[in-house]
Amino acid sequence: MRLLSLVVLLLVAAGCAGGSGATRPEDAAPRIGKPTEADRRAVAALRTEAEALLAGQAELFWTAWTGGGAVDLERFYDSYEGLFTRERLAALQRVRHAETDPEAARALGFLEDWLVGELLARETAGIATRLVALEAGAEIAVDGERHDWRALEPLLAAEPDPARRRALQEAARPVLEAIAAVHAEKRERLESAARALGYESALAAAAALRQSRKETVGVLAAEVIEATGPLYAEAFGSIARQLLGEELGAIARSDVPRLFAGLSVSTRFPADARGALDATLRGLGIAADAVRIETGAPSGRPLAFAVAPPADVRLALPATARDWAPIFHEAGAALHAAHVAPGPFEFAVLGNEATAEAFAVLFENLTADPAWLREHAGMTAAEASAHAGAAAARRLYAARRHAGRLEARLAEEQAPEMAAALYGVAMERAYGFPLSDADRAWHVADADDWLFGADALRAWILAAMLEERLVAEHGLAWWREPEAGAWLRELWAGGNRASPEELARRIGGRGLDVQALVRQLRGRLGPWLPADNAG
């Protein structure tokens, strides 16, 4: 624990811990020239092309998602080949740096972050394809039996024998070593590309793409681990004893899939998810026709498509679904996009993904709200409580896992020769049980090189804060109140312009409040908490 805390302190000391905004290359040490008229014309053309590309990409995926068939992205991107050049990025940086209008500068910053992300992704696209192929063909062997590598989690969930679960986990090591070798090549390429674009490191670039800093990400991860610790110990201590017959500190990483399989509840949602969604929107006074909805997607999974928001936002729904959580998640994302006010396209489709994700999670969380489940899914009180408790346990575990992976990745940058050990320290702290050498072998395959976990944590915290505000203003059944819907539409109008931290302050907080997430989860974990500690 002290080792990780020291690393976080070193990160804070090395940077500007007081701010949460992105550190782009020239922000740290301005050496950029003044923009020319040619630069301004190039940026105007870039904005037009980027908007067209994003709309076309969404349309392409919508057609494939709802009609079936493959997506030929390579052919699609061929027509935009001239968009992704360092020369155009440099012109954009000069124009943004000289922009005196804060709103215009913010929009251009979002465009710059998107272009940087695309350039970095293109640098590693070939290696990423090799990784996918490697994982698709990999196998693990145990007692003469060979299994698809991708089936490891289901195998662990179905295996009743703890010793065999450990053997399955150990059998993954040769595959992990092969994956690590390709990952090392990918990291080297990414590091070189990020430095060529002016960033101090690939992780600095990853943080900037989340409109954040490494130091801020490290502090967030540490706060999540600290704030959720007591609740995690209570809940997962109880879960481990009841489902595995062991204390939390005595289980292994290989036992976790089995544990979560035991958390699954037999009661399923009714078939009519669309009816529940429409009823919820009616209660909020939100027009359902703001989003184009098509049911019966061949993929069997829901997905929102912001083709040209706010006018053209679409939602593909499966014909039937055993779990409504993904449906309401995508519905929340679609509603957010469909209510953005006219303005720079960057605020509607670019910007901080965690802001949009927070509203998606807010609606997803309805399917883990016992009162909403009784009202819209027809569950009994016991069934609703069981569903809510299982969902809260998964969210709590996932939050600590994200935080641990972030701490491990940030610490590794400070001492790469200690990567496996640092991963072990971070994840043992997050999980609450020891890791074996086989578990530490996951330190590369499990690494969060792009710091995606930071966005997930920010979204979950902000969603909990939004829910607390809705409950405080409109009662426990806030989804029945048109005034609650009007308030949400006001927030949606900004699109992704505001960061999660800014939006948290707008709704009355001093910033992102991890305790809001803790309170939300404690309130729903009742079935797994001692009676005197249940919220």
Model-identified regions with their sequence ranges:
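C-terminal, non-catalytic "cap/extension" segments appended to globular domains
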Residues: 28-35, 39, 61, 65-69, ...
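Bacterial signal peptide processing site
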Residues: 17-20
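Post-HExxH zinc-binding segment in Zn-dependent metallohydrolases
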Residues: 221-231, 350-387
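Bacterial N-terminal signal peptides
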Residues: 5-15
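Conserved catalytic-core motifs characterized by acidic clusters
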Residues: 201-209, 250-261, 292-312, 333-353, ...
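N-terminal helix-rich structural modules
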Residues: 24-178, 184-185, 451, 535
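Active-site recognition of the HExxH zinc-binding catalytic motif
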Residues: 322-341, 357-361
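Contiguous, non-catalytic segments that form substrate-binding/exosite surfaces or channel walls
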Residues: 125-128, 169-321, 525
